């Protein structure tokens, strides 16, 4: 399965800054009925722990344009509580994905926009995003414009 351009466009425009990799995993499971092939323990550029999910030829973090660095086995000890917390969240999500989506307003909104926005509108938003990023305009401004 390839990375979905419509989903990435929405994540980077209308939902910029609202989603994390757990949300992306839940959305992929709900919309495409596709489970991750691998779970990667990582940290972001600020050193915050985050789980990334690997699919056939992309990662959940790519939908958010996040650069995550995988952590080593020794580093897992320092992030043990975060790992346990996020793995518990993953289990809750996987247990009943539709209930999780229903009880998470931003994911419910995302799915509604994903299903109801036309391909033309999403393509137009994607073009705006490319132009704005090329000109150095920040994501918050782009989010408000879409």
From Swiss-Prot:
Q: Does the keyword Transmembrane apply?
A: yes
Q: Which InterPro entries match?
A: Poxvirus_H7
What is the induction comment?
Expressed in the late phase of the viral replicative cycle.
Q: What keywords would UniProt list here?
A: Host cytoplasm, Host membrane, Membrane, Transmembrane, Transmembrane helix
Q: Tell me, what does this protein do in biology?
A: Contributes to the formation of crescents and immature virions (IV). Interacts with phosphatidylinositol-3-phosphate (PI3P) and phosphatidylinositol-4-phosphate (PI4P) lipids in order to form virion membranes. Mechanistically, mediates proper formation of OPG125-hexamers, and hence the honey comb lattice and spherical immature virus.
Into which family does the record put it?
Belongs to the orthopoxvirus OPG112 family.
Q: What is this protein called?
A: Late protein OPG112
Q: Which organism is it from?
A: Monkeypox virus
């Amino acid at each position: 399965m390839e990375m979905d351009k419509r989903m990435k466009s929405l994540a980077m425009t209308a939902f910029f800054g609202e989603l994390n990799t757990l949300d992306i995993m839940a959305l992929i499971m709900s919309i495409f009925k596709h489970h991750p092939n691998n779970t990667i323990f990582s940290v972001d550029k600020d050193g915050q722990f985050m789980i990334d999910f690997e699919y056939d030829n992309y990662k959940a973090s790519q939908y958010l344009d996040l650069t995550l660095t995988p952590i080593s086995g020794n580093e897992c000890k320092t992030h043990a509580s975060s790992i346990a917390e996020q793995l518990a969240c993953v289990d809750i999500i996987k247990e009943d994905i539709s209930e999780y989506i229903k009880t998470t307003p931003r994911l419910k909104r995302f799915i509604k926009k994903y299903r109801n926005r036309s391909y033309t509108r999403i393509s137009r938003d994607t073009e705006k995003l490319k132009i704005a990023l090329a000109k150095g305009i920040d994501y918050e401004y782009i989010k408000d414009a879409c």
